[in-house]
Amino acid sequence: MEHADIIKKTISFVKETLKDAEGGHDWYHIERVYNNAKNIAETEDADLLVVELAALLHDIADPKFNNGDENIGPQLAAEFLNSIGVDPAIITHIQNIIRYMSFKSSFDAPTFSSLEMQIVQDADRLDAMGAIGIARAFNYGGHKGRAIYDPNIKPEAHTNKEAYKNSTAPTINHFYEKLLLLKDKMNTETGMRLAQQRHNFMLVYLDQFYRECYQ
């Protein structure tokens, strides 16, 4: 099957699978990450098919919405890719990207890395920053019933994956526990440049947020 046909079938599969997904992890999130990844890949010597498929499938079954099970996503991706005849080596590569690209995985010693994963990781992290990242953070916080802000609950410097996953802190804390840390975790030059712009916007937002809280 040709590259374009594989991508077309994958887009249809992802749209159908995520049609009822939470707003910050729906098809439109996938589409933004997909476009980010293609943009970053233009300046990198990467396997574009792997980049595109991993970007499209990276949240096909996010553990946050599957009782923390980190195996469902890679398994579902493999089953679909097998069904359309994708090369087994490519499938394994994509499974590894899905399994190890998340922010929470950064708390563990790296067990897998590739240029393609770095590109998709940057693309996904960009969508957690800037105006879109702010909107997604509050959308997810509302979905989980979390407070917007509580000055009595201070941000924590999480040192392990379980502490990060189990946090129920107000959404503003999430800026300090993840979003503002992403700029320094980017892998590619393009990712770093785009991240700086979005990072700066979040700082402006927080400044205005506190002004309105305490004016």
Which positions does each model-derived feature cover?
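Short alpha-helical hairpin
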Residues: 1-15
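Divalent metal-dependent phosphate-bond-processing catalytic cores, especially two-metal-ion Mg2+/Mn2+ enzymes
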Residues: 2, 18-27, 31-44, 57, ...
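Short, well-structured alpha-helical segments
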Residues: 27-34, 52, 91-102, 203
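An active-site-proximal "capping" alpha-helix that borders the catalytic cofactor pocket
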Residues: 33, 69-83
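His-Asp-centered metal-binding catalytic motifs of divalent-metal-dependent phosphohydrolases/nucleases
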Residues: 48-65, 73, 94-104
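Conserved strand-to-helix beginnings and helix N-cap segments that scaffold or border functional pockets
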Residues: 66-70, 131-132
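Hydrophobic, well-structured mid-protein blocks that either form specific transmembrane helices
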Residues: 85-121
